[in-house]
Swiss-Prot record:
Its EC number is 1.11.-.-. It is an enzyme of class 1 (oxidoreductase). This is Aromatic peroxidase fscJ. The lineage of its organism: Eukaryota, Fungi, Dikarya, Ascomycota, Pezizomycotina. It comes from the Eukaryota. It comes from Fusarium equiseti (Fusarium scirpi). The gene is fscJ. SUPFAM superfamilies: Cloroperoxidase.
Amino acid sequence: MKWLHLLSVVACVADEVYAFPSHLHGAVGHLTASRLSSVVDEAVRSAHEKRLLFDAGNEPIDVTGKHEFIPPNFEKGDQRGPCPGLNALANHGYIKRNGVTNLVETIGAINKVYGMGIDLATILTTMGVVFVGNPLSLNPGFSIGSTPKGNDNILGNLVGLLGKPRGLVGSHNIIEGDSSNTRADLYVTGDASTMAMDQFESFYDMASDEGTYDFDTFAERAKIRFHETIETNPDFYYGPFTGMIVRNAGYFFACRMLSNHTKGSHEDIMDQATLRSFFAVQKEGDKLTYKRGWERIPTNWYRRSVDYGLIDVNLDVISLITKYPELGSIGGNMGEVNSYAGVDISDITGGVLNLTKLLEGNNLLCFVFEVVKTVSPNSLSGLFSIVVPPLKLITDALGTALLDLSCPALKDLQVGGESFSKGIQKKFPGAKINASL
């Protein structure tokens, strides 16, 4: 199956523009698109081959030798960002230790170390490359933190890229969204990357009497944070992709892929020591201390034996919404706290889907992919002067996904009689940054 990608937007553009003659855009664009598709295909093929050579579950992940823990050197420009899993991969040398990685490296690493399915790994990695990195580089990549200082060309800028790649720190409403487990909302603090220790401690204290956390604990925490954000963030936005899928997947990923799956174990049970290690928290007596960027894979830690892929995310989101229906409500606050308003899915889809039908089969993924397909063309025009390559990645991925998932035909998506993008941004103040999926 040819998974190439997903996603939406970054509208804020830096002053510096890399211009290119308009009459050459078509030829260059199609050549770049073809080359980039080949890079993605090679990444998937390589990851599959390495996966066959790796006997998951029979040995702990190596954290010695070339994979020993080395914390980041921020003074030298090392990058760390909002994703604990990627930060840990960099600290152990599974991706480049400076935190500026590429497509092939990242797909292979998150599959090998964490057991993320290659389909899901490809989608998320390509998302990072297209929307916060540089897909037009000869070596397409992205920063897991912010734009590397002192080396604006570290990602190999070519023609067609507007401004500088911003890294995952600049991915609000694209990859990173409001109401996360351990990160504050961007509009509230101005920093959605650094862990908020009070939020970590609140979750840490939810451990069972045995000091563990299961799926139900993470699901309850997702519900709690949703309501906390309504009460504290006047610009809270909970979109179909960044809210229902990505935001909630952040809770599941910690449970499903960061838990220690000791030899022979198929349970996704997180313990406090593992949680502290992956979230860069050290314990001395009863005191917990956060060391930014020090996320670490524990010694004698085993990856899951069965990969966690796109369909697993779908099932987990459906399970979550079934238990806490408010987490299936697309919408946001209206500029004031406690002013949350939802958008009727039936209205968006022209009556094809409602919340009940959305939770049947693969309809949730189908709907979200349709949102991405609808929003992407205008979104990408704010990022690239040559839109063909990144847009082709998205349309290829969505076309493949929609066919594989046997998706229903959906009419043009609208909000309040306008296009989805315009309608959602007009209705919710928090949706105005980037293109907001």
